[in-house]
Swiss-Prot record:
It comes from Methylocella silvestris (strain DSM 15510 / CIP 108128 / LMG 27833 / NCIMB 13906 / BL2). The lineage of its organism: Bacteria, Pseudomonadati, Pseudomonadota, Alphaproteobacteria, Hyphomicrobiales. Its main location: cytoplasm. Disulfide bonds: none annotated. This is S-adenosylmethionine:tRNA ribosyltransferase-isomerase. Pathway: tRNA modification; tRNA-queuosine biosynthesis.
Amino acid sequence: MRVDQFDFDLPDASIALRPAHPRDAARLLVVRPGRLSPAALDDRFIRDLPELLAAGDVLVVNDTRVIPARLDGFRARGEALARIEATLHKREGGDLWRAFLRPAKKLRAGETILFSSGDAKLAARVVEKGEDGEVLLGFELSGAELDLALERVGRMPLPPYISSKRGADESDAADYQTLFADRPGAVAAPTASLHFTPALLAALVAKGVQIERVTLHVGAGTFLPVKAEDTDDHRMHAEWGEVSAETAGALNAARRAGRRVVAAGTTSLRILESAAGPDGAVAAFSGDTSIFITPGYSFKAVDLLLTNFHLPRSTLFMLVCAFSGLQTMRDAYNHAIAAGYRFYSYGDACLLYPAAPRGAA
């Protein structure tokens, strides 16, 4: 498909720079695709989720934890020092991270970069250099020691549409983590889950909604624009994820009982679809996924999708168009812009119904 079909104009004022407080005060647009008529759009709030979901529904959340993956440092250039910024995006080993560096044009394999924040310092060597500013960094520390050093040296990796307007501050350390954050490794938040509060979670459980956890370590590639003119020519970034055998069993039991699976976020949906077989059964999964979902995809594992509003021409907007229909999502986004919904990571959300039942092409 032509990528320009997924383009739209968004006023700069629609981009949220801070989250709603409390988190469940964010707005929620419920989108029900119409078969023979326009989509039904319902303006609600996140706190209405217990009313909108049914007893027996299974809500699948992503328990990844965002690490402080934005690093400031210097590299030697003759006798001078040149400033450099790194954004870690995928761990490749105990001391190895793939990262986007800028400026990176003059970097060479073997060079050393010294990252610092206050008195904290951390050195890394450029192991290999890739394309578009991507490098493989080998740090002087490994494993848990490296994780602790990153906590001291790194900054919260706010998305570029926020960081270009303001720097990260102390409030982002809490605001950009979800209630479910447990397993460190993400360099971007699974933003649909940012809306959950303990009170909302308790209300959902009291309603009879079952909560299951999966992991997908969201990479910085999630913000990369699609540069290709056709979706067939886009190379999707890989992210590491895991579905436990226990979670897979719970989802399959729910499916056999005719209960709905509700994905909290595109990350939860992508790892579930990666783990699902042709018959919709979910298997235990642990490894990389580079699943790229565009219109025409037949969803196998998910019945409803809770998700934020996404960037134009992004793989995530393509995914929601695949789920609920291209024209439906165009209509929904036009409504959201006109109604003053807040977009992107710190913004409001949609509860999407599918254009076709799962398993249907």
